[in-house]
């Protein structure tokens, strides 16, 4: 890999890391190409970026984007995106289904996060799920009132 290619990779990573709310670092050693494609497809569906990069290049991009404190060792795959829940969910779900995939660490909301925090975030409902729950709570009294009125109407009609 030439120096200009390395500079280009660092610039792209730096741009992506700056715009991201979450960066998750995972071990992918032993995963087949088919499984990596599955991860990439799942990530793409959730607007999450996935890339395998040398640690030295990733470290430079992380430091340049202000995301410091991550200890990078061994082989790593990086997942990042603007929505920290999506990134956490993609990583946690894939780890759950694949023994050889392991979440190592993350940088979320300006601080280094451990595996427990990533898994806790993955269990939280997404924004759309929260909105659906809220609408359901708001609609419950109206729905119950309507059911009561219909029951009263049916009772009056049967008399």
Swiss-Prot record:
Keywords: Ribonucleoprotein, Ribosomal protein, RNA-binding, rRNA-binding. Pfam families: Ribosomal_L10. The keyword Lyase does not apply. One of its GO terms (cellular component) is large ribosomal subunit. One of its GO terms (molecular function) is structural constituent of ribosome. Gene3D superfamilies: 3.30.70.1730, 6.10.250.290. The keyword RNA-binding applies. GO terms for biological process: translation. HAMAP family: Ribosomal_uL10. Belongs to the universal ribosomal protein uL10 family. Forms part of the ribosomal stalk, playing a central role in the interaction of the ribosome with GTP-bound translation factors. Part of the ribosomal stalk of the 50S ribosomal subunit. The N-terminus interacts with L11 and the large rRNA to form the base of the stalk. The C-terminus forms an elongated spine to which L12 dimers bind in a sequential fashion forming a multimeric L10(L12)X complex. NCBIfam families: PRK00099.1-1. This is Large ribosomal subunit protein uL10. It comes from Campylobacter jejuni subsp. doylei (strain ATCC BAA-1458 / RM4099 / 269.97). The gene is rplJ.
